[in-house]
Amino acid sequence: MNIRLEEEKDYFEVENLTREAFWNVYRPGCFEHLVIHNLRKEKCFVKDLDFVIELDGKIIANIVYAKANLRLKNGKEREVLIFGPVSVLPEYQKKGYGEKLIKFTMNRAKEMGFNEILITGNPNYYKKYGFESASKYNIFYEGVPEDSEFPCFMICILNKEKYDILGGIYSDPKCYDIDGAKLEEFDKKFPYKIKEKRAGQLQL
């Protein structure tokens, strides 16, 4: 197993594995492969945290990071880190590869001087990496009332001795926005797959 930075020659393979990992999971089809494709061209993209896992010459997992702005209570902005998508080929899921990639890159982010990582995800899963509800630190997701619980929005503080944010509002970077028509066109580059409605999807 080799954890290394993604290279330009890997782009299509990584986009395809991301598509395989997310297809019909949260909605019929998926858009995460286009997110990655678009993200690489954006200023918010953190190239030095774009890692893959290679196994026997095959890329089986990928993680990408981006920088986002947190609007502080005092009106200023603070740069924070976010990650995702985290993609693992279906046949390699639940074998610890995603966990290895997340831990490796979080340590690398700390070495690079980043201190706060914000994500949305399953709190029961991400708490093992040190993530806590962001509302505990008076940080809230844009559009969600501050007095309502949103446990899926979490923060990991990599070095609490350096933490000095008194509260703020987070919004996703525009580089994560997806245009439906562009997604349909982009999907034509990949092998045909059937979009299915499944129980448990977030969008039906």
Language model region names:
Residues 2-14:
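A short beta-loop-alpha structural element at the N-terminal edge
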Residues 15, 22-70:
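Active-site rim helix/loop that mediates acceptor-substrate recognition in acyltransferases
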Residues 48, 149-154:
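Short hydrophobic/aromatic beta-strand or adjacent loop that forms the aromatic wall/cage
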Residues 49, 53, 84-87, 114, ...:
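Internal, conserved structured core segments that host functional sites
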Residues 75-90:
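Conserved acetyl-CoA binding element of GNAT-fold acetyltransferases
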Residues 83, 92, 96-104, 114:
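Conserved acetyl-CoA pyrophosphate-binding loop and the N-cap/start of the following alpha-helix
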Residues 111-114, 121-148:
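Conserved active-site alpha-helix within GNAT-family acetyltransferase domains
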Residues 160-204:
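Acidic/histidine-enriched, glycine/proline-rich intrinsically disordered or flexible terminal extensions
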